[in-house]
Structure formats: C-alpha cells, structure tokens
Amino acid sequence: WKNIIASKSGAATITRFDATDYKCRIACEVKPADHEYGYDASLDVDHKIQRQVDPFIVFGISAASEALRDAGLDNMTEEERLRAGCSIGSGIGGLPGIESESLVLANKGPSRVSPHFVHGRLINLISGQVSIKYGLMGPNHAVVTACSTGAHSIGDAARMIAMDDADVMLAGGAE
C-alpha cells in the first residue's frame, strides 16, 4: 500500500520462470517473504497446505483470511458460521501445477505423480480451504468465468444473501 501511495512501481524482470523467449520479460510478481516488500504466506496458510496446492489457492486463502480479519468475522460463533459461506473462484487456476505434473507423468510415469495433483489444483479448493479453516457451514461456491470470475463471485454471493441462503458471504477471486 505504501508503494501505491508513493507511486512506486512493482514491475520488474520476471523471476518465476525463464522468460528469455518471450517478447515481454517484465511483470508485477508477488515478491517472496525475504524481499523488502515480500508476502509471507505462512501468516495465514499452514506450510503443509502450501506444499500441496498451487499458489493461486494460497493467495486466495490469504486474501480471505485478511478480509475476515478486517471485517471482524474471523472469530464467528458456531451459530453465525452456520449461515456464513464462500463464493470464491479463479479464472484459470492451477496451470503451473498441471504443467509440472504433466511433465512428471511424461518423463517418470504415473507412479511419480503427486498424490496432491488433483486436489491441489482445483479451483473450488479456495472456497473449500477457507470454509475448513474458519468452519463456515453456509454455501460453498466456486466460480470460473475467466477475467470476470471475481465480479461473478461477488454477484453470486449477493444473490445468496438476498435469497436468504446465507447471512454472510466471503466473495472474490484469486489467480
């Protein structure tokens, strides 16, 4: 936030993959925890879960945790949790994990594919993991509508509240 206020750009040379053959080699990547402005996922997401799922799920859980804290809803009673749910999605989801496990399958065979392959890439895992972490027992919804996923998630959550399916809905998207 301080950098936004100071008009400081987060754009830099891509580090997460070899971009040599690409026309564009800059991006606004989320910096690791050891960076001056880095993101420390361990504040909100257990290390075991981080190892099992793609980064979009980790970002989604972290964002949801921050949203619940900011709204004062991170310690709801059981009765409140019965009518609280999630509507969180992703436009593409776990492509990095799908790519890496496809290479494992092709080069090393099926016995070497991670047992977390499927459940670590599914778009509904953000809502699922958030519901598990916070004990949310209301609607659990995952949207996949490309670039409009976050907006659709918010709209669907609003409709669920309007239709009295829930009192509280956590909504958004992660990529």
Model feature map: region roles:
Residues D156:
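Internal active-site segments that recognize and position negatively charged phosphoryl groups
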